[in-house]
Swiss-Prot record:
One of its GO terms (cellular component) is large ribosomal subunit. GO terms for biological process: translation. It comes from Mycobacterium avium (strain 104). The keyword Transit peptide does not apply. This is Large ribosomal subunit protein bL32.
Length: 57
């Protein structure tokens, strides 16, 4: 693992952290029990197997 050679200032640390931005998850259409829903891609299998409640939104 990389170890910093010198201490980084608080301002530099915070400005570096500010570069990271969360991305919006893309929703994919899925048909469950004749109804069309939009879910994140990682939840497609769970939605098809009826493991998650899609009507709670």
């Amino acid at each position: 693992m990389a170890v910093p050679k010198r201490r980084m200032s608080r301002a530099n640390t915070r400005s570096r952290r500010a570069q990271w931005k969360a991305e919006k998850t893309e929703l994919v259409g899925v048909t469950v029990a004749g109804q069309r829903h939009k879910v994140p891609r990682r939840l497609l299998k769970a939605a098809r197997l009826d493991l998650i409640d899609l009507d709670r939104r």
